[in-house]
Amino acid sequence: MGEQRAAADSTRDDGDRAGGGGNGESVTTVVVAGACNLGIALAKAVAGAVSGSSAMLSEAAHSFADTVTEVLLFLSLKRSTRPADAAHPLGHGRERYLWALLASFATFVGGAVFSVHDGVHTLRYGEELGSPALSYLILAVAFVLESVSLSRTVRQLRGETSRLAVSGYRYLRRTSDTAVKAVFLEDSAALVGLLLAFGGLLGAQLTGDPLWDGLASVLIGALLAWVAYVLARDNASLLIGRSLPARDERAITDTLNAQPRVVRVLDLVTSVYGPEDVLVAAKVDFADLATAAEVEAACDQAERAVRRAVPAVTRVYLDPTPPRP
């Protein structure tokens, strides 16, 4: 080690995998949501065609968009687990955020734009409403199925928030597992959308005025646009490269500073590649060590300590650097 530089890079074994809920659970959550959404979308489309309801057709578009989203999220989870290669030495972890970003576009275009357009058309030109009986039945069944899908996601979220000792809001705001976040937001939006569609149908039925149905459709579109914005913002941030939360960075800094051969951490950089894939690079002022072997041992000891403190860390690069005068 002629340049007084040490780099410690390793991949965790199974015993260290405590940094996230695991890809398997996220895949199951996405598959359950996708299957529910596809069945619901077909039923809503039939009900919308029979009743002539703009809100029901908007809900059908909503569910079809959610189904496309789940397919893209499934691809993101599968492709991001491919091992590192010569062209991608840090792996393919961030590919999950590319597919998830495309999924947010599907939600916006396939759900929000269609719903707002159909709602505005109804508000301007009206519509002929048929019997809403089938629509009410489909809405009730869809509410049950969406609740089942959401309950599965909530169970996963509770497990993660309990393990990490954080609130649900904080976890959803900062999590790098955007697939689970997407399913949670979409299922929650779906339940709200069903209530809006029910209100629009009921208002149109009681008053004979399709304005209520068109207004419900526009509100559903606005809700989907908000979901798409939140998911696009988060995935774009992670795709560009986002650091660990400040609490985790403080834990890493404190862990390094606590090592017997470390004087202090001069600089620390973290970068998230996935829920269980984080890179750490730091300039560290080590106590004067006489040999390269001693530097290597100090770096190895510090790396192991960092990975114990924050199990999501997969790569640690330490640069022995003297303090600047």
Task: Give each language-model segment a name.
Residues A49-R82, V116, V120, K181-L195:
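Acidic (Asp/Glu-rich) catalytic motifs at the cytosolic membrane interface
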